[in-house]
């Protein structure tokens, strides 16, 4: 449970509260359905009890991850699979086909570790997952990401669009997940498909 108090509300003025997905103790909240209650306190409210007998309650779903492609897509289960043989090495990510220009969002919020262009990856960005030991890499974007190294990113925040830059055959997202200590910092890539399939079900 998380409680917020606002003392600056006024009639006819829109007021917002942003929840960062943590509990009152500062720990990440679990995935699931949450409800929020709007209530008022004070003597001026007592006179309104007859018309507002119960607080307004709404619900929403909270998930710590988001599927990175906002549009029609198809997993490449052939040469685009993690571990598929390549010239002298194996494929280190999962390719997901989507039309060029399809929006991409951060699967997990965090801090941008790298953002740039590389001959094989094309336009790419690497984000370290806040509250996780993992790094998330997105490659072949049509244009450079609008985000810069060191910027903070929210889960689900736009990071670019699908493209075919670099060594890419057709429009798709090449997505990698790396364990600690991170992407090309001594960590190792692992198969992201089970995670992508899970996120795809609720995103």
List PLM regions with ranges.
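Short loop/turn motifs at secondary-structure boundaries
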Residues: 1-60
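Conserved, short, structured surface segments that act as functional micro-motifs
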Residues: 35-36, 92-95, 125-127, 134, ...
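Zn2+-dependent peptidoglycan hydrolase active-site motif and core
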Residues: 106-145, 149, 171-179
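Short hydrophobic alpha-helix segments
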Residues: 4-7, 116, 162
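Surface-exposed, glycine-biased beta-strand/turn segments
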Residues: 35, 39, 44-45, 52-123, ...
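Solvent-exposed coil/turn segments that connect beta secondary-structure elements
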Residues: 41, 101, 130-132, 180-181
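Short coil/turn motifs at secondary-structure junctions
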Residues: 24, 43, 115, 178-182
